[in-house]
A protein has these predicted regions:
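Short amphipathic beta-strand/extended segments in non-transmembrane regions
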Residues: 58-62, 76-131, 233
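N-terminal Sec/SRP start-transfer signal
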Residues: 1-31
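Mid-to-C-terminal secondary-structure elements
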Residues: 118-134, 143-249
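Extracytoplasmic
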Residues: 55, 88, 109, 140-142, ...
Length: 249
């Protein structure tokens, strides 16, 4: 039976060469497009999947009627400490702020992403110092920053970037360390990192916060508890504000 079907198929292919070629080509193109679509979907759904305990890392977000119900991930810096102090299921709360800046390196202007963050975010993102010191993590009036391996190779080639100056919009910073960070296939790429300089008050709502929950945490229950126990500083902004968390992967 199979042999007979193959004979008929081959006979039709030979007899209807043009139609067969068009059909085979269409099938091949469709298969390639389908495969590329599957690859793209998989790629888009696996951002930051490589991080340790990625299934327990969430981004804090707000949603209030004052802004017509729009969801925002911009929150106050002080909310991080509040979350870890009042909700035992939250193991880590790491505030950070990524901003694209026009910088000058060796008198050449380039675009770079600067990360304002503390040690909690560095630990959560597994950012390691491979050369230099931790001075870039010192508190206020800090004029030192760290550069990633990739950025160091891009802008300084074979030169040692330690001690070099980087001119930013408002400040001149000195590089004191080189860090290793996974900047591929992530939502949080950066070129430089330094201690937070932005306002840390409740009214300066321009930070992002990543939290890491403890194993077996009921996320819906945690969200309900957070909304039922919002800090007074957030309630004063709007009585309709709601706070939640969403998976980063």
């Amino acid at each position: 039976m199979i042999k007979h079907c193959l004979k008929i198929a081959i006979r039709n292919l030979v007899k209807y060469k043009v139609q067969s070629a068009i059909s085979i080509l269409g099938l091949a193109v469709g298969f390639v497009c389908f495969s590329l679509s599957l690859y793209w979907i998989h790629y888009e759904m696996t951002y930051d999947h490589f991080r340790q305990d990625a299934d327990r890392i969430y981004m804090v977000r707000t949603n209030d009627e004052y802004t017509e119900g729009k969801i925002s991930t911009r929150v106050p810096y002080s909310l991080a400490a509040y979350l870890t102090q009042h909700f035992p299921k939250i193991a880590v709360a790491a505030p950070f702020h990524l901003i694209s800046e026009r910088i000058s390196v060796n008198d050449k202007y380039q675009d770079a992403v600067f990360s304002s963050a503390d040690s909690a975010w560095m630990n959560l993102m597994d950012i390691r110092i491979i050369k230099g010191n931790r001075n870039f993590m010192l508190p206020k009036d800090n004029a030192e920053i760290a550069i990633t391996e990739e950025a160091a190779k891009k802008w300084f080639r074979t030169e040692d970037p330690i001690g070099k100056e980087v001119k930013m919009l408002r400040h001149t910073k000195k590089i004191c360390a080189i860090v290793r960070a996974e900047n591929r296939h992530t939502n949080f790429p950066f070129d430089f990192i330094g201690n937070p300089e932005l306002g840390k008050t409740w009214w300066y709502i321009t930070w992002n916060i990543l939290i890491k929950v403890k194993p077996d945490t009921d996320i819906e229950e945690l969200e309900s508890k957070i909304n039922a126990n919002l800090p007074a500083e957030l309630k004063q902004v709007t009585s309709t504000r709601k706070t939640g968390i969403e998976r980063i992967i």
